[in-house]
UniProtKB/Swiss-Prot annotation:
GO terms for biological process: chromosome condensation. SMART domains: BHL. Keywords: DNA condensation, DNA-binding. Histone-like DNA-binding protein which is capable of wrapping DNA to stabilize it, and thus to prevent its denaturation under extreme environmental conditions. CDD domains: HU. Heterodimer of an alpha and a beta chain. GO terms for cellular component: cytosol. GO terms for molecular function: DNA binding; structural constituent of chromatin. This is DNA-binding protein HU-beta. InterPro entries: Hist_DNA-bd (IPR000119), Histone-like_DNA-bd_CS (IPR020816), IHF-like_DNA-bd_dom_sf (IPR010992).
């Protein structure tokens, strides 16, 4: 399912126009992104938790040349599925 299909599903499920469903989805995405940028996690009980983890710097290798290089530390967004979501999928 892509974003436009998700908007269609939200519009049908919530009996909203597609434009309103699209704005609602965009607002959710912006809110989650903003919270993660601020260093907070977003917990949706039963669905899952969005969080940011720190990935330390490491040594990598260019596969074409074999030369080693340092890969900088980075922040990595993550998602851990909640119990209800896991049960619904299985």
């Amino acid at each position: 399912m892509n974003k436009s299909e998700l908007i269609d599903a939200i519009a049908a499920s919530a009996d909203l126009p597609k434009a309103a469903a699209g704005r609602a989805l965009d607002a959710v995405i912006e809110s989650v992104t903003g919270a993660l940028k601020a260093g907070d996690s977003v917990v949706l009980v039963g669905f899952g938790t969005f969080s940011v983890t720190d990935r330390p710097a490491r040594i990598g290798r260019n596969p074409q040349t074999g030369k080693t290089l340092e890969i900088a530390a980075a922040k990595k967004p993550g998602f851990k599925a909640g119990k209800a979501l896991k049960e619904a999928v299985n």
